């Protein structure tokens, strides 16, 4: 007995097994055929060899483990019919994928195989075991497979061959006898088969093959356009989803930024309010502690005479510039420091002129005024603008 599996079926099975998150199982669909080989030697001795070949065309995976049996290994026939439906007669075996295990059938798998052989009515039912092994450092991964045909005494291992997979010589390249199950192909053959096939199925004219080829190409183009349109729709939907996700992320970021800015402004406002209140309370306490600074000192003649350093008669009031005090108060009230300085300088000059005036009058009224008149007086101008007697 030998077995063969098509290349695309084997690659699909390996891809599904390698990308599965856990162990999984399913059924193998195909057919069993007999091959008769005649060998003739130089001595005209013929030899006939009969070989039973199991051809695996496709696989039908189950949704999860224990989908058609329980933990004790009892097969549920209703679940089995629901999975296989009308493909029950095409089942030639079943498979199981395990990770990091030995390539041997377990006791539960042997019980399941016996029940499936009885329920499906397939005496040549086979079991394909696929194992996935990786090294400790996960640098090397190996996918191993073995095909069993359980007997009464032991589990017989059957050689599994894959057409078009082997050496690159021309002899190894051959076409597998896999039936075509495409509905479009069957429809085209049914429409154009009468033109170039006889009743016995023999081809009439080779030129009609091009018509069939063109018809098949049109069908393929139509299907390709439909697939392309569906892919475009999926691509546009995916782009729209990505755009919406980007907008959501941007709005979330803007909202967080606004909240952070509002919080920082609130903190700055609170700090400024506290600082202003602290400064106001400090100024009020300082002003209360120095009440003499609140009102200017009263003007007295003794203070003016002591400042000038010259005795003046008591009946002479201190002359003031017209509007100087009022102007000074107004400027202080308006908060103009430069104007205050100007008024103060004008008042100082006025006081100095009045002081000179007092000195000259005092000399004129003194008893020695005659002698003073006889002696010449020289006035010199000092750098500060005051008049001094020499």
UniProtKB/Swiss-Prot annotation:
Intrachain disulfide bonds: none
Residue ranges with Basic and acidic residues bias: 355-365
Polar residues composition bias: residue spans: 377-390
GO biological process terms held by the UniProt record: attachment of spindle microtubules to kinetochore; cell division; chromosome segregation; mitotic cell cycle; mitotic spindle assembly; protein K63-linked deubiquitination; response to ischemia
Region (Disordered): 288-390
Keyword terms of this UniProt record: Cell cycle, Cell division, Coiled coil, Cytoplasm, Cytoskeleton, Microtubule, Mitosis, Nucleus, Ubl conjugation pathway
Subcellular location: Cytoplasm; Nucleus; Cytoplasm, Cytoskeleton, Spindle pole; Cytoplasm, Cytoskeleton
Main subcellular location of this protein, as a coarse class: cytoplasm
Highest rank taxon of the organism: Eukaryota
Record-stated family: Belongs to the FAM175 family. Abro1 subfamily.
Protein name: BRISC complex subunit Abraxas 2
Organism: Xenopus tropicalis (Western clawed frog)
Lineage: Eukaryota, Metazoa, Chordata, Craniata, Vertebrata
